[in-house]
Amino acid sequence: DPRYQLHGTDALRDWMQERADEVIAAMADTHFDIPEPVRTIECLIAPTQTGGIYYTGPSDDFSRPGRMWWSVPKGVTEFGTWRELTTVYHEGVPGHHLQVGQTVYRRELLNKWRRMMCWTSGHGEGWALYAERLMAELGFMDDPGNYLGLLDGQSLRAARVVLDIGVHCGFEAPAEVGGGSWTYDKAWTFLRAHSNEGEEMLRFELNRYLGWPGQAPSYKVGERLWLQLRDEAQQRAGDAFSLKDFHRRALDVGSGGLDVLRDAVLD
């Protein structure tokens, strides 16, 4: 479908920037308090060629803004946006950029280590998955193609959990890939069956989770906690509940363990 196609890396970079800027304009002062320095994000094509999108935080004084990078595999010049809009929300706004940028900004609340160095996967990646779901709830993914991209991402993340736990805890592989002990080839077949990502991206994902035990489940555990926190905060506050106030209070905690986050937000 040409509606979801981009041609060339310049068009890809511009599309990323436009999506990020429009969300900042829509979200600031409505669903989020976004400090002025955090309202700038720079979207770039990464020098690496591994596939995927990632985020790097701003400098302490925001002279270098937060940046969202797309690592384009060598030779790839055509891009489908239907799968990637949800990833832009994950890595950019209201995902990692808002989360990390606000933490860096809160120097009156957090020490330098908490602002610039601390990262807990369940907290950070859980927030980014929560951000994806929030954007769907707010109507930003009502287009069927873009919503299909959200579901495709959820399928991959669920498959990664199965792979991570199965490989690192010694469980048998599913019957669909032959059962028995997990092997690289069985893991590859399993990922291919449960995601529409390109080969370069899936190879990157497979190598990542073979060598990083526990990271894949942390995404989903963290997402579940963020959703539970919001629901519980809303139940306690009733009609006085403010989504913007909830987000500000939760993000002001900075990165930390999930128990710490729960206690700080609900106590």
Which residues does each PLM region occupy?
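Long, His/Glu/Asp-enriched segments that create or flank divalent metal/ion-associated functional microenvironments
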Residues: 1-267
